[in-house]
């Protein structure tokens, strides 16, 4: 039951992950705030789904979900791709957001990425389609988390696609492609609500550390480094992340 007077934490998992990514946050904040977690299109429970949408479609659908659920005070907490969806949402509906928390994500502005990075982002599907699945499973788990809990959880989420590597490759390839296309739009992607940047010191996914340094430098949005955490820092250091989110929300009117 949604309390319309309370803040709603809207958790958006990263690419190929699902609602379980935020289990430790749901457990901690449940009962304190309204909670919404979204399996993005083509992910987990949101399957089957056609791959004919872009990042702004995802933002629009999220808006429709919030409308339907009568969520009027959303604070988006987006991990990786979820953070990009949050920025697209902020671009389309700047007055709707009460707060934005980026966890191991990066800015959507075109100026932060090179032409070579955009070129690669659009051509990742064949890589994921032809990479040996067992190696992909290992790199996909060890590469995003440092803790046993974080790695085991990511492995469980990846095993949803066990036996259907084509679907996994489609989800990943399409996700990176629509990310590149959103960057190429060269829109302001300005966050006008209270915001917080969080990044693990062991985040080796892409260039997240470099991007977050530049994002903080250019916008002065507070940036918190999570010592010893990987790309899924909310699974590596959940207590620290929960404390930061809790402190952030307490300052939102």
State what each model feature region is.
Residues 78-82, 86:
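Gly/Ala-rich beta-loop-alpha elbow adjacent to hydrolase catalytic centers
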Residues 24, 88-92:
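Active-site signature of alpha/beta-hydrolase-fold catalytic machinery across serine-
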Residues 2-48:
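Conserved HGGG/HGGXW glycine-rich cap/lid loop of the alpha/beta-hydrolase fold
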Residues 91, 98-130:
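Flexible "cap/lid" loop of the alpha/beta hydrolase fold
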Residues 195-229, 235:
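Conserved loop-alpha-helix segment in the C-terminal half of the alpha/beta-hydrolase fold
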Residues 36-77, 243:
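Active-site loop/oxyanion-hole signature of alpha/beta-hydrolase fold enzymes
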Residues 235-247:
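Post-His helix in hydrolase/transferase enzymes
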Residues 111-113, 130-190:
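Conserved alpha/beta-hydrolase catalytic His-Asp/Glu region
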């Amino acid at each position: 039951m949604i309390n319309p007077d309370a803040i709603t934490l809207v958790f958006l998992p990263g690419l190929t992950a699902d609602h379980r990514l935020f289990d430790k946050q749901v457990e901690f904040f449940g009962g304190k705030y309204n909670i919404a977690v979204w399996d993005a299109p083509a992910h987990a429970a949101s399957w089957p789904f056609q791959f004919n949408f872009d990042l702004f479609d995802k933002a629009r659908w999220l808006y429709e979900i919030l409308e339907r659920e009568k969520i009027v005070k959303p604070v988006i907490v987006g991990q990786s791709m979820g953070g990009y969806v949050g920025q697209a949402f902020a671009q389309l509906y700047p007055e709707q957001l009460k707060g934005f928390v980026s966890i191991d994500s990066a800015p959507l502005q075109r100026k932060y990425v090179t032409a070579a990075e955009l070129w690669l982002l659009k051509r990742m599907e064949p890589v994921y389609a032809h990479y040996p699945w067992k190696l992909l499973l290992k790199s996909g788990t060890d590469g995003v988390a440092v803790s046993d809990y974080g790695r085991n959880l990511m492995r469980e989420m990846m095993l949803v696609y066990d036996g259907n590597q084509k679907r996994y490759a489609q989800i990943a390839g399409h996700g990176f492609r629509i990310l590149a296309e959103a960057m190429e739009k060269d829109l302001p992607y300005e966050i006008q609500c209270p915001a917080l940047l969080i990044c693990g010191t062991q985040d080796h996914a892409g260039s997240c550390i470099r991007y977050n340094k530049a994002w903080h430098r250019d916008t002065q949005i507070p940036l918190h480094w999570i010592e010893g955490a990987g790309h899924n820092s909310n699974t590596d250091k959940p207590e620290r992340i929960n404390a930061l989110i809790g402190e952030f929300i307490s300052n939102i009117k």
